[in-house]
Amino acid sequence: MYLVADILESKKMNIVSYKSPEVSLPRDGGGILNLKEFRPKNVVLFFYPKDATSTCTKEAVSFSQAKAEFEKLNTVLVGVSKDTVASHEKFIVKNDLNVPLLSDDGAEICEAFNVWKEKSMYGKTYMGIERSTFLIDGHGNIIKEWRKVRIKNHVEDVLEAVKSL
């Protein structure tokens, strides 16, 4: 598997128009979810830093509330973080979420999408997920990306992008 991060570094460009890296990760409820299972549907793949934090909760709830609208447009929603499957399951129950959440505990998929970044807080640096969303078409091509996402109106912006396909 190639890393999108390698493409970005070597060509100094974004990843739009490239094939999506293969995504196959443990999911809530058990088992493995592979994005290829959804073809020929579009996929909105959203990466978020941590379950049960205020901004991540707002984002996941917003996507869940818009799920039916995305489904009408032949589009599936999938969330990814480094949290465990058990954490995802608690997060889903507590917030009545209805989208699958994948556990990338080793950050391999986060690295492949170049969302695993150095961050800093209170003078300390650490590695973490940069909130990002990718729109992947039914052929597995990345057709739009949102980086350093601010959640206000984000779901609406993603929905508009899907409508424009």
Feature names for model-found ranges:
Residues 2-165:
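Chalcogenol-based redox active-site neighborhoods
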